[in-house]
Amino acid sequence: RFNGEVVAMTGDGVNDAPAIKLADIGVAMGITGTDVAKDTADMVLTDDNYASIVAAVEQGRIIYSNIRKFVYYLISCNLAEIMIIFLATAFGRYLYPFAAGEVFSPLAPIQLLLLNLVTDGAPALALGTEKGDPDIMQQKPRPPKEPIINRFMMNGVLIQTVAITFITLFAFGVGLKHDRLMAETMAFITLASSELLRA
């Protein structure tokens, strides 16, 4: 542990309690273990089977991976929605000079609510309950201090946000040449489709 490694310690007796407490992950035996060892441990093996540790690590990796996918998806989609509303409201007269200087939002409030309920919720829920990669146990352990959204993912968020924002604002501009209702509908359909494709 002093060399920076993540250490798990298993034990069942009172004499194991100090080592279990010092370890990053203390594991006590549920059947043969003493109450002191169980109280000190982070995890208790109810069946006293060491193979359960491997299953628990696998489940933990899958859950963490799904949380990352869930957060990654929601950040990129919601950031795109924010940018679309902000850019169209703040710079609409420059982006769409043919619209006679009107200040507008590409999406009605009810459309934003529907987007957040349907296209954000359902795919995010599906991502959060995925079975996980089949080779998840062959992957290297992640550094304990690594953030949920790492630098690679943040670059992906920025690229996806810019792409979704640009496509939606372009569709809104095309629709605006006809009328406001068509523009809002085109922006809504484009944004919803982009978010579903992103999932």
Model regions and ranges:
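Acidic, divalent-metal-coordinating active-site segment for phosphoryl/phosphodiester hydrolysis
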Residues: 13-22
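Alpha-to-beta junction loops
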Residues: 24-26
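Membrane-embedded transport module
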Residues: 1-8, 28-199
